[in-house]
Amino acid sequence: MNPSSIQKIGTWSTRMVESTLARYPLKEAQWHYEHGLQVMAIEKAGEITGEPRYINFVTDWVDYFVKPDGTIRTYTVEEYNLDQINAGRLLFSAFRRSGDERYRKAIELLMTQLADHPRTNSNGYWHKKIYPYQMWLDGIYMGSPFRAEYAQTFNQPEIFDDIIHNVVLIEKQTRDPETGLLYHAWDESKQQRWCNPETGCSLYFWSRAVGWFIMAVVDILDYLPENHEKRQILVEILNRTVEAVVKVQDEASGLWYQILDLPDRKGNYLEASGSTMFVYGIAKGVRLGYLPAHYVLSARRGYHGILENLIKVDRDGLLTLDNVCGGAGLGGDPYRDGSFEYYISEKIIPNDPKGVGPFILAALEMEQAGVDEVL
């Protein structure tokens, strides 16, 4: 689509999809969690709108990586990195649309990693092989919805119990009893310099980490059978987490801070990816009956705040999403110490996929809820 035509499109979700397609050539694609998230959002927009160009783009993206023998370009099992699983969620719909066995083989290749992926002594997945005995909130989103869709698609219900175990374990270990918020990560060995030596938890409530977790739970529930005996456990976890998140929503803007509970600390800022993830997770949770209806007010405030404060429209109608934290992790080389100063020092990148993908998903949810925002 010609960029000058984008401003004539009626919804924010499709305007962002068109803006993304205009600036995201296939040669820049990466088999990585953030690109997978962005492409999944484009696919969801295609399913809802019926726009074939969106689905065609997704097909081309998947085919750019999946070889005829089912191996995945740039992916290696032995890296044992949960971040590399998330893009695999696109393989299920590719398989359903085509019946092509190479997509099934690619799915099984990713499951090979998950079958042997290192675990903590309490049987939770390490975030990555290079981060021993560590569980990160991010990792629940990276691996668990994929496994849940696999369990549903290929009728392997025993996987659901292990998925729920991982969610319950990390919530138990990272939840702060005073605020109800979740710390970014947990080191079972309590050896990392970034962790509290008594609890093993990192020291701050990073908005996007909690956003990953909320998105993971609402997406896992898409596949978990309605009659599963532990389904209510996930619903209760979702409610606890959302209740805590809504309490720290900024009153003036409707957005959320990079470090959730320290709005007045110098350097903290209203961050886009966490805010878009919260709007998506809350709105979807309300729509599907997991959350009380009154939470839609929080989602609406957040959505309005995103459009009012973080979305820019250029002369061609292309959208830009500002204030996206480009990346934040713990440990590694150079070592990331998990301090407040570390989290606020990470580079801010406009239109980073980790913000654009959740923005599209959030906008689709709000549009389904009948919210018609005009900037």
Where are these regions (language model features)?
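CBM-like carbohydrate-recognition segments
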Residues: 3-36, 48-55, 64-82, 86-88, ...
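Long, well-ordered core segments of solenoidal/helical folds
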Residues: 7-28, 56-73, 105-124, 157-186, ...
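Inter-helical turn/loop segments and adjacent helix faces that build the functional surface
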Residues: 49, 98, 150-161, 220-232, ...
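Acidic/serine-rich, low-complexity amphipathic helices located in mid- to C-terminal regulatory regions
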Residues: 138-153
